[in-house]
Design a protein with these regions (language model features):
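Active-site microenvironments that recognize anionic phosphate/pyrophosphate groups
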Residues: 1-115, 123-202
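Short "domain-exit" segments at the C-terminal end of structured domains
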Residues: 203-207
Length: 207
């Protein structure tokens, strides 16, 4: 089996990345439907444009600010966004309804993303193992920084690019009430913020 892309669904998507001036649906929060969870400005909802068959596609709006970005968030906002995102991702994993669950963020006009407004996507794959081609070697590399269980390295076995940075932390820490886990969740967010995101593949803790 393989993921099937539905071209018909994709044809109706708003795209202000390639067509500046297009109305942003994420700015009009009153018009949003099928909201799963909300915490402050963070909104997790069903993706209106289901372009991948045999999946559950959801979107996580990070901020009410259309021009905001992970690299510009103040510490409190950054930590809130990342905790919310990791918690939503963990919820889909814990549901055991999917063979695998992916969380990712497309950034920039060449990333394939259609909307500028800061957001991530969490996708449950019903039949596919999205991690099947990954090995522990993909998360290893030249050590750059480590504090506690949070580490940053330059990958020596990049997944899809010439230059990738791995930011790793123990899986499930965001859902824990333990003070150490919460502190390291914030460290994980801090490390992602300072990484050179224009040139990296940021690896969330998946294995």
């Amino acid at each position: 089996m393989a993921l099937v892309f539905d071209v018909q669904q994709a044809s109706g998507k708003p795209d202000d990345n390639r067509r500046p001036g297009t109305a942003c649906p994420f700015c009009n929060t009153e018009g949003l439907t099928n909201i799963i969870q909300r915490d402050g400005d963070c909104i997790w909802l069903e993706n209106k444009f289901k372009t991948l068959r045999a999946t559950r596609q959801t979107v996580l709006i990070e901020s009410a600010d259309h021009d905001a970005d992970l690299v510009t968030y103040k510490p409190d906002e950054l930590h809130h966004v990342m905790r919310f995102a990791l918690d939503c991702w963990q919820q889909m994993i814990d549901s055991q309804q999917y063979r695998s669950v992916l969380m990712y963020k497309n950034k920039g006009p060449l990333s394939g993303g259609s909307l500028v407004h800061p957001h991530m996507q969490i996708v449950g794959l019903e039949q596919e193992d999205g991690y099947a081609a990954l090995t522990s070697a993909n998360f290893e590399g030249i050590d750059v920084w480590q504090r506690g269980r949070v580490a940053v390295n330059i990958s020596t076995e990049p997944i899809m690019g010439f230059f990738e940075v791995n930011v790793s932390a123990p899986r499930g820490i965001a859902a824990s009430d333990d003070a150490r886990d919460q502190a390291e969740t914030d460290l994980f967010a801090d490390a992602i913020q300072v990484a050179p995101v224009s040139y990296t593949h940021l690896t969330l803790p998946t294995i």
